[in-house]
A protein has these predicted regions:
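Non-heme Fe(II)-dependent double-stranded beta-helix
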Residues: 1-14, 21-156
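Short, solvent-exposed loop/turn segments at secondary-structure junctions
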Residues: 24-27, 132-134, 161, 181-184, ...
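Non-heme Fe(II)/2-oxoglutarate
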Residues: 43-46, 51-54, 188, 202-206, ...
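Short, surface-exposed loop/helix-turn segments at secondary-structure junctions
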Residues: 76-79, 147-156, 209-221, 273-278
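Active-site rim elements
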Residues: 90, 99-105, 162-164, 216-226, ...
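A short beta-loop-beta micro-motif enriched in histidine and acidic residues
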Residues: 121, 150, 160-172, 223-224, ...
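Double-stranded beta-helix
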Residues: 137, 169-172, 180-243
Length: 325
């Protein structure tokens, strides 16, 4: 069993990240979510066909090839069915999302929470800033009209820059889970070691995207940039101030990861309009959420609320910020 040691925490505090090799078992811990996503893909393909967005169901293809093909033909629309959150804008009562039991159980995985506890303590809240990223080979995205960081390269950013300012003092921990192998060729994570020491950096509008996102200007990142290659079950822990991005997927297979966030109970999440939950509480164990159906309903309620009242902007900086010129 992998445990987080004092030396690991020291490395995290010094470098802004730590890689826990083999924290999760690829079959025991990740097998259920891989199985769940086969069903998610089947249902999504049926719905996309019914909506007239795709013509072919690609049933003859294996999972990896099929998901890549559908992402391409749907112009990225499939990603909404795969992600464990709602999009930043254009939410309606039919906006797809995934809130399945395997995803919920992974967020509550005891090995994961044992590790998280070493970083932020035993009163653990599941922050709703969370994503499933199934990134196809880059050539499948060559003709898409939308640039989505969940399926394309992820720009340089800090997770502290993707939420509202009320969470500036929240002790948010990012937990990045490798479902497949992640290496340089297929678009692994890149980090700027020690960049967390600089605090919150300027983020500017990314002109390459017609979907709302912001990135850190090149001049602020520095020369020290490190690729982190991982195997299935490896987990990367990141400070909310650590600058990071991902490389393009130049392989012929998907690169699949999840990034989750946790913070101490009672601290703002930075996305108050999305629902989090108590994942662990040693002081009040009865307050823990352990029913995936309740989690799913909380997201469905949020979707209905956001259909009537759109969410606040996710962006911390104005597009015409003079420092971005």
């Amino acid at each position: 069993m992998v445990e987080i040691t004092r030396e690991n925490l020291t490395q995290f505090n010094n470098e802004g990240f730590f890689v826990a090799k083999g924290l999760l078992d690829p079959e025991i811990d990740l097998g259920p979510i891989k199985a769940e996503y086969k069903e998610v893909l089947d249902n999504a393909v049926s719905d996309l066909q019914a909506r007239g967005i795709i013509k072919n169901n690609y049933m003859e293809l294996p999972f990896e090839k099929r998901i890549s093909q559908v992402l391409e033909e749907s112009d990225g629309e499939l990603n909404k069915y795969l992600d464990i959150t709602l999009p930043q804008k254009d939410i309606n009562s039919q906006t797809p999302m995934h809130c399945g039991p395997a995803a919920f159980n992974l967020i509550r995985n005891s090995k994961l929470l044992d590790a998280v506890e070493q970083f932020i303590g035993s009163e653990i809240y599941s922050n709703p800033t969370q994503h499933v990223r199934i990134k196809p080979p880059a050539h499948y995205l060559a003709g898409t009209t939308r640039v989505l960081s969940e399926i394309d390269t992820t720009v340089w950013h800090q997770d502290a820059g993707t939420g509202t300012s009320d969470a500036d003092h929240t002790n948010t921990l990012t937990v990045w889970i490798s479902v497949t192998e992640a290496f340089i060729e297929n678009g692994c994570l890149m980090v700027a070691p020690k960049s967390h020491r600089k605090g919150l950096a300027l983020h500017c509008h990314d002109k390459r995207a017609n979907y709302s996102r912001q990135s850190i200007p090149e001049r602020l990142i520095g020369e020290d940039r490190e690729p982190i290659e991982t195997s299935p079950g490896d987990v990367i822990f990141l400070s909310k101030y650590t600058m990071h991005s991902s490389l393009p997927n130049l392989s012929e297979n998907i690169r699949w990861s999840l990034d989750l966030r946790y913070n101490p109970i009672g601290q703002p999440t930075g996305r108050a309009w999305f629902p989090g939950f108590i994942a662990r509480s040693k002081s009040k164990p009865e307050s823990e959420m352990n029913d995936p159906s309740i989690w799913k309903m909380s997201w469905e309620r949020a979707r209905e609320n956001l259909t009537r009242t759109p969410p606040s902007s996710f962006q911390r900086w104005s597009e015409d910020d003079p420092n971005c010129a």
